[in-house]
């Protein structure tokens, strides 16, 4: 299970700084492109630490769990960055809380 700390952008950066100072590994996820129905805009951010604790949001809940899992995997593999792409068809949109289908691209990177 993942634990969310905050949604405010200012708090996200403060939280990341606190985690880094306490020697935790941190991944920053940033929305870099959207198409169609997307609850959050380009530039939305989320941080994730190695324990799965996160602050912020990149999709309003639609793909957060996948982004958290990918972020933890990035830390485990000691990779620096990765681009994630998620597509939701019109038929599946309601299942993830969207009015219609869309696409979201998210860039994740370690910031330690």
What are these regions (language model features)?
Residues 2-112:
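Segments forming oxygen-rich coordination pockets for charged ligands
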């Amino acid at each position: 299970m993942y634990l969310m700390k905050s949604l405010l952008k200012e708090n996200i950066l403060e939280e990341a700084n606190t985690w880094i100072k306490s020697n935790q590994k941190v991944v920053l996820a940033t929305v870099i492109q959207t198409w169609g129905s997307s609850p959050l805009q380009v530039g939305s951010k989320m941080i994730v630490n190695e324990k799965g604790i996160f602050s912020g949001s990149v999709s309003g809940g639609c793909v957060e769990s996948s982004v958290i899992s990918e972020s933890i995997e990035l830390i485990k593999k000691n990779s620096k960055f990765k681009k994630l792409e998620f597509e939701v068809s019109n038929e599946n949109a309601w299942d993830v809380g969207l009015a219609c289908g869309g696409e979201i691209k998210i860039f994740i990177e370690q910031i330690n």
